């Protein structure tokens, strides 16, 4: 009897231990640690908006192995990709958002540590290279890159902007070690250096080639699209984490997809939110997230973006920041974004084949007619109005601008589309040229406008003169 009771007690205790073990396993607390770059505003759909709007919670799994799981979601913000990578390699972060160059370095750093990371999605980019750019002090007489020979140009070292600068210098036929003085400088230092006249130019990534000019102390003289080198920002994950929790990776990407959809539907609203969190002006955020923006928010792995990663690896080796290559076929892993698209009832293949900018579906604020030709579109953001006004032409926008100013309305920003590259420009930073019929076309550079005007028999105007011209011919 005693022996039987003892055996029964042992069996009961064993059952309790097993039940306790099973309960602890099913009630596991799973960390989801995400590194963001909030001020790198084209990463918003991969971090800032997911965090601020609580989107991740909507998609986290609560069935199967996750039935009783608890989630510990952690967020940490960085100003660049390098320190973010350091914490990912150290096991302190599971996900990270960064550009092609730091992303490539992330993969190399993981390999060096005997681990692996995966580039799982694109967030925003340009197959031509827009987003990166070069600016000069606003008082500088420099109008083009060709005038910077022998000058000092600063750039965040080993960044995607550094890669653009090296390609731009090479296209001029210059030796980067002899014909220009390239120095390492992060944007927070470069802004002050530009204002103090300590550097002749600064090359940088999103959003600084637009932000500095919008603040009035710099002028953009080179857009990354002139280098015709694809650039993007995207999301990475620790491979071991992805293998253990693939459903969480898909959940993160589904949240990113929703953030992207929200940006497309209400760019002004979310440009304001990004401004509130980052201090980057909403008017600059709209340059990227508004329709026909500087970059395209595109989560699909287009061949050009795969190429950008390969180019980044080669350049990092040239800069002696990497001593090995990466197998792009394994480092870039699109299985998770494909699964996220499918779970969101979206067609990944259709998105992969689409190269269009964020579309503009609007009527001309002056005529009320639908805008169908986007090559001369201009926009006005009036303070106090929740939506940006769109116009089919710069002439129409500038005429409306004059009327708004007469009414005492405060203007937040005026935008125009570059006629050659198609990128969105701050109109007060652009150059304009007329054709034989007097229609205004916008350009980033004075030289581009002069070339167009010469070919068309027209004239060149800066923003002030272009607005006066539009009012005069009304």
PLM segments and residue spans:
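Conserved C-terminal helix/tail region of periplasmic/extracytoplasmic solute-binding proteins
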Residues: 316-361
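Pocket-lining segment of extracytoplasmic ligand-binding domains
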Residues: 111, 183, 188-277, 395, ...
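Short cysteine-rich clusters marking metal-coordination/redox-active sites
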Residues: 364-367
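Secondary-structure end/capping motifs
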Residues: 40-41, 244-323
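A bilobed periplasmic-binding-protein/Venus flytrap-type ligand-binding module shared by bacterial periplasmic
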Residues: 50, 131-141, 231-247, 433-434
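Short, glycine-/small- and polar/acidic-enriched structural segments
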Residues: 28-175, 181-184, 200, 229
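Ligand-binding clefts/hinges and TM-proximal coupling segments of bilobed small-molecule sensing domains
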Residues: 69, 152, 156-167, 172, ...
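N-terminal signal peptide c-region/cleavage motif recognized by signal peptidases
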Residues: 20-24
């Amino acid at each position: 009897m005693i022996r039987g009771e003892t055996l029964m007690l042992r069996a009961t205790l064993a059952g309790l231990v097993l039940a306790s073990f099973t309960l602890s396993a099913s009630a596991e607390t799973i960390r989801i640690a995400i590194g963001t770059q909030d001020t790198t505003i084209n990463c918003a759909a991969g971090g800032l908006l997911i965090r601020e709007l609580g989107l991740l919670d909507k998609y986290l799994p609560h069935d199967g192995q996750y039935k009783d799981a608890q989630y510990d979601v952690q967020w940490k913000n960085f100003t660049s990709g390098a320190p973010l990578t350091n914490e990912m390699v150290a096991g302190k972060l599971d996900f990270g958002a960064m550009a092609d160059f730091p992303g490539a370095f992330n993969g190399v750093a993981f390999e060096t540590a005997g681990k692996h990371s995966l580039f799982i999605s694109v967030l925003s980019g340009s197959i031509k290279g827009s987003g990166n750019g070069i600016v000069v002090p606003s008082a500088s007489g420099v109008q083009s890159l060709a005038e910077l020979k022998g000058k000092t140009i600063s750039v965040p070292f080993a960044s995607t902007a550094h890669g653009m600068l090296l390609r731009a210098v090479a296209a001029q036929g210059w030796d980067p070690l002899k014909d220009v003085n390239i120095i390492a400088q992060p944007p927070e230092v470069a802004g002050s250096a530009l204002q103090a006249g300590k550097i002749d130019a600064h090359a940088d990534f999103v959003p600084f080639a637009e932000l500095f000019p919008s603040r009035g102390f710099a002028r953009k003289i080179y857009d990354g699209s002139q280098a015709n080198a694809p650039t993007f920002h995207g999301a990475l994950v620790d491979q071991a984490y992805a293998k253990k929790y693939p459903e969480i990776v898909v959940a993160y990407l589904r949240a990113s997809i929703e953030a992207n959809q929200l940006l497309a539907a209400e760019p002004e609203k979310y440009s304001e939110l990004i401004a509130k969190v980052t201090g980057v002006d909403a008017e600059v955020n709209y340059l990227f997230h508004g329709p026909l923006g500087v970059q395209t928010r595109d989560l699909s792995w287009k061949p050009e973006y795969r190429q950008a990663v390969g180019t980044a690896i080669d350049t990092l080796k040239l800069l002696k920041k990497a001593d090995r290559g990466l197998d792009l076929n394994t480092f870039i892993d699109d299985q998770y974004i494909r699964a996220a698209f499918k779970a969101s009832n979206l067609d990944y293949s259709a998105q992969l084949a689409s190269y269009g900018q964020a579309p503009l579906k609007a009527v001309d604020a002056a005529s009320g007619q639908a805008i169908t030709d986007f090559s001369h579109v201009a926009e006005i953001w009036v303070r106090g109005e929740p939506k940006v006004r769109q116009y089919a032409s710069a002439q129409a926008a500038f005429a409306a601008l004059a009327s708004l100013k007469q009414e005492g309305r405060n203007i937040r920003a005026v935008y125009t589309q570059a006629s050659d590259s198609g990128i969105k420009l701050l109109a007060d930073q652009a150059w304009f040229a007329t054709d034989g019929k007097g229609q205004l076309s916008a350009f980033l550079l004075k030289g581009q406008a002069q070339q167009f005007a010469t070919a068309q028999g027209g004239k060149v105007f800066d923003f002030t003169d272009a607005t006066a011209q539009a009012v005069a011919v009304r």
